[in-house]
């Protein structure tokens, strides 16, 4: 089973090109003004064009209202929505039907009990994303450069499709894949030289680290 790789929080043509050339299956644009990775729909639309036919364009939002989402979907024409806030199962279902787009629902993980939150979303969200629970007082639900105990994911049913996120970088991706066998990975701050500033060299290094990890004889989840 091929590994899905999402580079998230892209803001420049150079970073998008590096992600696509490296083999990203998904590229993410963040629409959340409090984030240093925030981008306007118009700017994202210009960058998104390069991904057509090459990667899944993901619009990442945090408890966005219908008006904001209408503008994002109309302008950017994403292939998928990622909901990274406190959206309820009913909200996820509503947005799937409103925009006729698949939805990836993000969850913040710190301890085993946090995984129980996904139960009401099964059969509604198309995919899950597991990120580290943000530090106390943080206004950002993701992109904080911290990881969680990957061993917790061993309790997941084998049929759950998800992306692993939170503190991934070229130095730890092999261990993350070995411990989780994750079907997908999501990286943002791990390929930045400063918050919100993607570094082409770090993106290239990350893809090389993934390739090296994939060459190792471990079994990925079926």
UniProtKB/Swiss-Prot annotation:
Question: What is the superkingdom listed in this entry's lineage?
Answer: Bacteria
Keyword Ribosomal protein annotated: no
InterPro entries, per the entry = Aldolase_TIM, PRAI_dom, RibuloseP-bd_barrel, TrpF_fam
Give a GO biological-process term. L-tryptophan biosynthetic process
Question: Which chemical reaction does it catalyze?
Answer: N-(5-phospho-beta-D-ribosyl)anthranilate = 1-(2-carboxyphenylamino)-1-deoxy-D-ribulose 5-phosphate
- Top-tier EC class: isomerase
- The name on file for this protein is N-(5'-phosphoribosyl)anthranilate isomerase
